């Protein structure tokens, strides 16, 4: 079985950001030489996530508003009693999840017509990483 592991690095300019990473993942899959298998894409931080959805700006805004509605920034999270101020970021990341697995078929990502891979940042303006691990034959 072939494997290839690479890391994508991020340092967003804003506290929350949604970054389309399909092209970077496609390039890593191509570089791996894997024709049939899968790729794991996983945020290596507890205040970030990875998800698959449409790359449409209105939908991205809807996702952001939905997450803010479910886990708004506020000062009274128990987590803040530790001196932190990012309780909402942890909850948003739980809702998005931290990883996706995408099939690789004929050497390419086997995504649906509108499916794209995104990195979701909820506590930005600092260095973060995403691991991309391709496995297969």
Regions flagged by a language model, labelled:
Residues 1-137:
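Active-site histidine-anchored catalytic micro-motif
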